[in-house]
Amino acid sequence: MIQTQSIVDVADNSGARRVMCIKVLGGSKRRYANIGDVIKVSIKEAIPRGKVKKGDVMHAVVVRTRKGVRRNDGSLIRFDNNAVVLLNNQLQLVGTRVFGPVVRELRTDKFMKIISLALEVL
């Protein structure tokens, strides 16, 4: 579960390394974001010559959480870290690669590109 002020890792090659959640989108009183939710983030750490720079405010979709996701068969898939993939204002991916595993629950019309770019889909 990601909330405001949470520091999370970036799982793409956009140039950002760590970002901070500044807003969970989807309602005025919404507090937590789970896998597949869109959040507003601020870049806190970035590499030189990347596509984004420190201080940029962007959208991001949550692809991994330590809380995990519960499947219909009762299984729970958890990860070692919280990670997001950066999006632009039109909710298109900024990077061209996705690192680490992602879950099948991202398989919606909006985020099918993340599934196709990911090396491992659980």
Swiss-Prot record:
Cited SMART domains: Ribosomal_L14
Alphabetized UniProt keyword annotations: Ribonucleoprotein, Ribosomal protein, RNA-binding, rRNA-binding
GO biological processes: translation
A single GO molecular function term of this UniProt record: large ribosomal subunit rRNA binding
Phosphoprotein as UniProt keyword: no
GO cellular component: cytosolic large ribosomal subunit
PROSITE patterns: RIBOSOMAL_L14
Lineage: superkingdom: Bacteria
Family: Belongs to the universal ribosomal protein uL14 family.
Assembly with partners or alone: Part of the 50S ribosomal subunit. Forms a cluster with proteins L3 and L19. In the 70S ribosome, L14 and L19 interact and together make contacts with the 16S rRNA in bridges B5 and B8.
Known role: Binds to 23S rRNA. Forms part of two intersubunit bridges in the 70S ribosome.
NCBIfam families found in the cross-reference section: rplN_bact (TIGR01067)
Protein name in the entry: Large ribosomal subunit protein uL14
Organism of origin: Coxiella burnetii (strain RSA 493 / Nine Mile phase I)
Upper classification of the organism: Bacteria, Pseudomonadati, Pseudomonadota, Gammaproteobacteria, Legionellales
Chain's gene name: rplN
